[in-house]
UniProtKB/Swiss-Prot annotation:
Domain PDZ: 300-391, 414-500
Signal is among the record's keywords: yes
Signal peptide range in chain numbering: 1-25
UniProt-listed InterPro entries: PDZ, PDZ_sf, Pept_S1C_Do, Peptidase_S1_PA, Peptidase_S1C
GO biological process terms, semicolon-separated: proteolysis
Protein name per UniProt: Probable periplasmic serine endoprotease DegP-like
Entry's Gene Ontology cellular component terms: outer membrane-bounded periplasmic space
Residues where substrate binds: G255, N256, S257, I312, G313, V314, Q315, I316
Keywords for this protein: Hydrolase, Periplasm, Protease, Repeat, Serine protease, Signal, Stress response
Species: Brucella melitensis biotype 1 (strain ATCC 23456 / CCUG 17765 / NCTC 10094 / 16M)
Classification via Pfam families: PDZ, PDZ_2, Trypsin_2
Sequence similarity: Belongs to the peptidase S1C family.
Length: 513
């Protein structure tokens, strides 16, 4: 082979080898190859385009205020710890969900007798002065400075200060308060100033699971923002006759009381009022007054300084399964009238004990609280059509609504003592009864502790005045009413009882052998 050919051959082999080497760089296997491949295919996640709450908070926070309350304390002596709490605080049971929340407002001990004695100050009079008794939250609802807060924040005060988001402190006066819904309205004393304000939204459109943003003054830290969701609707926590709270899981703590809960449109859907907490801090269970309730109350407070509600004057109780069965009702809805108040609107219209109010102006009544809310929302002087269930049929009764009295005293107790005679036993119910001395009903003298009657709260001294709306005067009358109910296919009988001037209904199941 000639030298020229050998040279060309070598060049060709070299070129092939180089090409193979270069190709091998792209097909390397093993750890190095895996590393290169991983780097080439690194995962990249595009973050979701969520606006968050910053824009909302920026707009609404200037309208949220802190509320400071002071009380004019008259000259006193230092006689150990003294406490100042909202009216009725001492009557709240220890387990009440509001008691721990209220304790933050004014429940601070003033003075210490032992330390004062050591300093030689015991029993020395102190001049009158203003002392802080509460702090909470609120929000401005008008350009001229009307502020909504809770009644329990302001109820024990004489002087009020509103602190704006920028730290400005302004005096305010109390326009009106409504203890029944725990709402109050203040007016900032700054006639030349225009305030940023927020509007009430429609809480009826709020669904469980919707976002909610709370802004307030927890522990004195004004302008604090938390978020969560609506956990439940229509909560009754025993705080008042019109409980209809929205439950939220946004962090709400001491000092948030009276602050707003916003929807994502920046409208107020609730007023934060209470928390449930074994520890005193937020555990994700807070309660807000619905905006629909607040708007009605606030409008009246601004216009009149008080709230006027409709009232029909009835003592009512829930319709239980047994009561529904005893009356032939298909559903456990409505409110059974235990006793109409003498000369009250309901009594004048013909409402009787034992009637079940099932609707108001065509709207179904779910339970006693629903009835109370519906009637309260009707202006005094107007007429309302009440649908009542009486003697196995529905009928409509028109009632003229009256204004609710401010305070109704408790009825005096009435003794049901009976010295008398041989009682008759209703074996099927474990009751022993004797005729009442006044001829109105029969008095229970003994109750079998293992009976259905005992389980349903019937006690010695109770007076049975009717069975299935039939007046009874003897044990025989009771047995006749029970027999009639059994023949008609009823599964229970309805007893009307009186005790301490209070009337109530109890349903007892019919023992069918």
């Amino acid at each position: 082979m000639s030298r020229a050919r050998i040279s060309n051959y070598r060049k060709g082999v070299a070129a092939v080898a180089l090409s193979a080497a270069l190709a091998g760089a792209f097909v390397v296997t093993g750890p190095l190859g895996a590393l290169n491949e991983a780097r080439a295919e690194a995962v990249h996640v595009t973050p979701p385009q969520q606006a968050g709450f910053a824009d909302l908070v920026e707009k609404v926070r200037p309208a949220v205020v802190s509320v400071r309350v002071k009380k004019d304390v008259q000259e006193t002596s230092n006689r150990g710890p003294q406490f100042f709490g909202p009216p009725g605080f001492d009557q709240l049971p220890d387990g009440h969900p509001l008691k721990r929340f209220f304790r933050d407002f004014g429940m601070e001990p003033r003075g210490d007798s032992r330390s004062d004695n050591r300093r030689g100050k015991a029993n020395k009079p102190r001049p009158g002065h203003e002392r802080p008794v509460a702090q909470g939250s609120g929000f401005v609802i008008s350009e001229d400075g009307y502020v909504v807060t809770n009644n329990h924040v302001v109820s024990d005060g004489d002087a009020y200060t509103v602190v704006l988001d920028d730290g400005t402190e302004l005096d305010a006066k109390l326009i009106g308060a409504d203890p029944r819904t725990d709402l109050a309205v203040l007016k900032i004393n700054a006639p030349k100033r225009k305030f940023v304000y927020v509007a009430f939204g429609d809480d009826n459109k709020v669904r469980v699971g919707d976002w909610v943003v709370a802004v307030g003054n927890p522990f004195g830290l004004g302008g604090t923002v938390t978020s969560g969701i609506v956990s439940a609707r229509g909560r009754d926590i025993g705080a008042g006759p019109y409980d209809d709270f929205i439950q939220i899981d946004a962090a709400v703590n001491k000092g948030n009381s009276g602050g707003p809960a916003f929807d994502l449109s920046g409208e107020v859907i609730g007023i934060n009022t209470a928390i449930f907490s074994p520890s005193g801090g937020s555990v994700g269970i807070a309660f807000a007054i619905p905006s629909s309730t607040a708007k009605q109350v606030v409008d009246q407070l601004i216009k009149k300084g008080s709230v006027e509600r409709g009232w029909i004057g009835v003592q009512i109780q829930p319709v239980t399964k047994d009561i529904a069965a005893s009356l032939g009702l298909a559903e456990e809805k409505g409110a059974i009238v235990a006793s109409p108040q003498d000369d009250g609107p309901a009594a004048k219209a013909g409402i009787k004990a034992g009637d079940v109010i099932t609707a108001v102006n065509g709207e179904t009544v779910q339970d006693p609280r629903d009835l109370a809310r519906k009637v309260a929302n009707i202006a005094p002087g107007e007429k309302a059509a009440l649908t009542v269930w009486r003697k196995n049929k529905a009928e409509e009764i028109n009632v003229t609504i009256a204004a609710m009295p401010n305070d109704k005293g408790k009825s005096g107790s009435q003794s049901n003592d009976n010295d008398g005679g041989q009682g008759e036993t209703l074996d099927s119910y474990g009751l022993t009864v004797v005729p009442s001395e006044d001829g109105k009903g029969v008095v229970v003298t003994d109750v079998d502790p293992d009976s259905d009657a005992a389980d349903r709260g019937i006690r010695s001294g109770d007076v049975i005045v009717s069975v299935n709306n039939q007046t009874v005067k003897t044990a025989g009358d009771i047995n006749k009413a029970i027999t009639a109910a059994e023949k008609s296919g009823r599964k229970a009988v309805l007893l009307q009882l009186q005790s301490n001037d209070q009337s109530r209904f109890v349903a007892l199941p019919i023992n069918q052998e």
